[in-house]
């Protein structure tokens, strides 16, 4: 008894007097399933074998009911219809009718009209709008099957109705196919699909299969009056079991409504969403943050990203060609953030930019902007890498700086002075000329401006070599390049020079080189890899060391250094306006030349190691533009030979 009580509070009476109270079990209609334990007690009089049967409602207690006198069928009724009385319907549905089905029927008068509620049965009906058919549908659930009835023509879904009877699919389909009046529905919610048959035929099938009471109130003529209304939910008349059942069905009805596009259920959610959206919008102060975050938040991030992404291009261009120090910081920050979490870059860039501001950002930007803009974003990321690797060797920083330094152009002027270049400028006056021939570092601050147009194309080639030389130059720290005398000539190719300068930035040792590198950084940006530039350094070292003012101290004449592989790009950079065209050709050669001092010896005077230059005399043309072509050639020849 106790166990039974535990199953259902409603059933305690059953528990106490399971047999006598069998009817009481009817009270919990919804709990009929759980009530089966009491049934088992009821069944005890009959046969414990039925204890298991309770799960199968049909067999519940027909035998039990017979022996106990209290038809366990009531338990069946509970399952289907919580009626304390023996329910013939239950027995009919139950497979055990063979045992005591007749007996159970006898006590209970079977309602063939479907208008009378079985004892203890409470109507549970839901309605949804069947948009496709333009009609309301009343739904009654029996044995877990939702049987629908149309409001307009009162046709009933025969497929679902026969499913309640537990009929096999083949038999069910055969019966429905033989129906003269039928409406086949193949599209729509699952509970509305099937073969719809007239009300009368459905009632006949229900009576024949003895499921009429289970389907109550499906066949009630005024079924609309029995509709469940949320306001009725609290009525005391509705038993807790009924409430539970109703609650359980609510989801079903809601689903049905969704499928049928029920107006009430679906609308509220949409309304809520709209409200939440509108409220945030309307009252962004308090709700906007919260309400918007769910929906708009995605949008907002999108906006932020949009700003970020657009900004980098603008910043990049500004950095390259523009000297917006603020924008350069922002740009590096924004770009870096997008690609790499550029904050480190932005920070490093800011620092390095300050140092490398001297780079020829102001002048470089024009040409650099063109290349840098296209490459800028990618290179910025690459540069960011150099920054990290660079800090050890500063070249990276300078490269980064070069990029950001573009933005800092205004700073670059004084920064350059801060950098070794300013002092170099005096020293490099001669070297500057030579370097002009190289077209490398000499571009310095002022050079940057001119180089933009022609060198850009060259920068790409020069970057690799330039970077290589740059690293050497960086070691040289003091760059004869600083001499800005060449700035004018170099300036046009400053971007190319920048690559060379970039090489020096790799060296980072020399502040000047870094600024130039910064200028070249644009080129580097194009190359996007400081490393490629560093590759050049070995060859450029040989030459640059000689040609650099530092190189001279090393015993390498700055002239030779300039002729060095780095020099070739430099010449292209300096390229002096005519040299630019040559520089481009030279670049092709440069790829080869950096490794070939021989070419330099022949005609690479001015630091250009280019077969073409030697053969075509392009170098000569470019050098003609050079302020000190003769010196450069002499230096180049001497330095290269000395190196060898």
Curated annotation (Swiss-Prot):
Disruption phenotype: Produces thick white aerial hyphae but impairs sporulation. Affects the expression of genes involved in central carbon metabolism including glycolysis, the TCA cycle, and amino acid synthesis. Decreases pathogenicity after inoculation of detached wheat leaves. Residues 456-465 have a biased composition (Basic and acidic residues). One of its GO terms (cellular component) is nucleus. Residues 584-612 are annotated as: Nuclear localization domain. The keyword Transcription applies. The keyword Hydrolase does not apply. SMART domains: KilA-N (SM01252). Signal peptide: none annotated. It comes from the Eukaryota. Residues 124-230 form the HTH APSES-type domain. Residues 38-47, 253-269, 334-357, 371-383, 395-404, 525-544, 635-644 have a biased composition (Polar residues). InterPro entries: EFG1/Phd1/StuA (IPR029790), HTH_APSES_sf (IPR036887), KilA/APSES_HTH (IPR018004), Tscrpt_reg_HTH_APSES-type (IPR003163). It is found in: Nucleus. Residues 18-33, 87-104, 315-328, 509-524 have a biased composition (Low complexity). Residues 158-179 bind DNA. Its main location: nucleus. Residues 18-58, 86-120, 239-644 are annotated as: Disordered. PANTHER family: PROTEIN SOK2-RELATED. Belongs to the EFG1/PHD1/stuA family. This is Cell pattern formation-associated protein StuA. It comes from Phaeosphaeria nodorum (strain SN15 / ATCC MYA-4574 / FGSC 10173) (Glume blotch fungus). The lineage of its organism: Eukaryota, Fungi, Dikarya, Ascomycota, Pezizomycotina. The gene is StuA.
